[in-house]
């Protein structure tokens, strides 16, 4: 029996010898490669925190002591050590193990958001709560190096530093991609001394003694202290933390488990806020990850664990289509610049950066700053393109509203991973953007249905010079092109026309749900229901031509991949009412709830967003229509209560 098989919880770690700990680290890496290769997931980050996490659970008493992982995708080892190794075959599968910390899974998981830079604020609040309630408990926050580029971390550090007697240990997982190692043995020695309680006592005693000397004493103390501080500043970056009043320990080899234990033990004993700087290597111990120049296998799909290779789809994905289209436009227009929040590769801007290195700005994990910086670029005569995941727009909403839209600045925001994203769970679904964007005065929002309309709508967005524009698209492969039958007033695409001037049902499809709407229309046609399908292209604001067309039908059904409250359906309905159009409306989309992880297809099926379910509902609505002017929102919960969700 291997060592890993004997680990059922953190207590088991404390019984192991140093040799067994080394063996356990090797077994965990082998386990991670085999399991993540089979399911997909965040491989590189977890290979880099094996020894670090082992040391954490040897020194601290979880869950009595709170261990919080920022960017929770680096918590796989934590899950293995807290009794969940037998569930890794279900990682990121419906009903299985989450790819992030999950409070429903284990008492060892304190939080579950995977958005970066939040852990220190959680830690600050927990430490205050423990102090106020008289609980002698430690708080540990594991912060990925990239997270420290987010302003929220520094807001939290400012507050943590004020709690001199509150035990908060901040482990900076520095994998070398953002921070340079601290220089020299003197820096190591000073760091070790300044975190030792005995040194603090000696320093306090010396300070009092020197200051009690005649008038020269205070001056001598200031000079000596200044010399030491100046020398320290010259050789070490830790001054940024010590100047805040937070003790710094490091750098520590994050792959030396014994060294990590020693550092964490001293940090724990200090009794106040301490930073432990652990230098790690992303993908450590797996050659294919170590040699992956792009991102050390940060996130993978299903791969062969021996070769490290996965099966790539031959179909282009939305991100690559956007990337090529932006480069084409930027080749013609020198005013186009790009902004990424530490995600140039995932959002398709890496190729742009290679071609135009002086016209791309990586602002770190700082979406708020990205948006206002974009406003500044626009004020300076440029047209910035901010490419972020839809779920991260939440953080930049105030800046988009007040710093971009209020000033009517031409900033184009490209939202990747819009709609249901699936396996990464509740925190990564991009289902909030349309509800948020709908309240911004003057904003224009496009939702392309295929590659051709993505290129076209991006081009149109880049021509707007009097306010912000948004282009949103989902994760994954681009569907086949869907040609329009005709275009109304240069705005709305009619994908299927009904026979005659009037019809029964008008389906309004948002973005890639166009193909779903056409499939529904085919089913309804067979039942003798007259149907037309339109793609608004620009879903905000609602086009007058769409409202006029709605007046010719008995029922309008909107189908969208975002939240129903404040979504496109309710916006279309409001536009119809304002124009005096009394056609009945039904909205189909995502309920306002946090969706558990599963494949996109499984989630859509669970929500009733399938051709079978929707055609069945629409048939029932048409058959039962006895009134007009009714606006009804439908989601999974209400449909289930009425028995309308298909079970097959």
From Swiss-Prot:
GO terms for biological process: 1-deoxy-D-xylulose 5-phosphate biosynthetic process; isopentenyl diphosphate biosynthetic process, methylerythritol 4-phosphate pathway; terpenoid biosynthetic process; thiamine biosynthetic process. HAMAP family: DXP_synth (MF_00315). Its cofactor is Mg(2+); thiamine diphosphate. Gene3D superfamilies: 3.40.50.920, 3.40.50.970. It comes from the Bacteria. Belongs to the transketolase family. DXPS subfamily. Pfam families: DXP_synthase_N, Transket_pyr, Transketolase_C. GO terms for molecular function: 1-deoxy-D-xylulose-5-phosphate synthase activity; magnesium ion binding; thiamine pyrophosphate binding. It comes from Rhodococcus erythropolis (strain PR4 / NBRC 100887). CDD domains: TPP_DXS, TPP_PYR_DXS_TK_like. Keywords: Isoprene biosynthesis, Magnesium, Metal-binding, Thiamine biosynthesis, Thiamine pyrophosphate, Transferase. Pathway: Metabolic intermediate biosynthesis; 1-deoxy-D-xylulose 5-phosphate biosynthesis; 1-deoxy-D-xylulose 5-phosphate from D-glyceraldehyde 3-phosphate and pyruvate: step 1/1. This is 1-deoxy-D-xylulose-5-phosphate synthase. Mg(2+) binds at residues 145, 175. The gene is dxs. Thiamine diphosphate binds at residues 73, 114-116, 146-147, 175, 286, 367. It is an enzyme of class 2 (transferase). Disulfide bonds: none annotated. Its EC number is 2.2.1.7. Binds 1 Mg(2+) ion per subunit.
